[in-house]
């Protein structure tokens, strides 16, 4: 559960920081 929460948080942060999805890491590409 902790890992899932951490991954979700990291994904939200990465999506917030990413301006160009082409430059996003594949793991963070599908966010929402």
Swiss-Prot record:
Compartments it resides in: Secreted
GO cellular component, one term: extracellular region
Disulfide bonds: 15-31, 18-24
Tissue: Expressed by the venom gland.
UniProt entry tagged with the keyword Disulfide bond: yes
Keywords recorded for this protein, A-Z: Disulfide bond, Ion channel impairing toxin, Neurotoxin, Secreted, Toxin, Voltage-gated sodium channel impairing toxin
Example of a GO MF term: toxin activity
PTM text: Contains 2 disulfide bonds.
Entry's family note: Belongs to the scoloptoxin-03 family.
Function (record text): Toxin that specifically inhibits tetrodotoxin-sensitive voltage-gated sodium channels (Nav) (IC(50) of =about 9 nM). In vivo, insects injected with this toxin showed signs of neurotoxicity including twitching, paralysis, and body contraction.
Stated name of the protein: Mu-scoloptoxin(03)-Ssm3a
Source organism of this protein record: Scolopendra mutilans (Chinese red-headed centipede)
Lineage of origin: Eukaryota, Metazoa, Ecdysozoa, Arthropoda, Myriapoda
């Amino acid at each position: 559960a902790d890992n899932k929460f951490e991954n979700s948080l990291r994904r939200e942060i990465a999506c917030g920081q990413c301006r160009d999805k082409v430059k996003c890491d594949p793991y963070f590409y599908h966010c929402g």
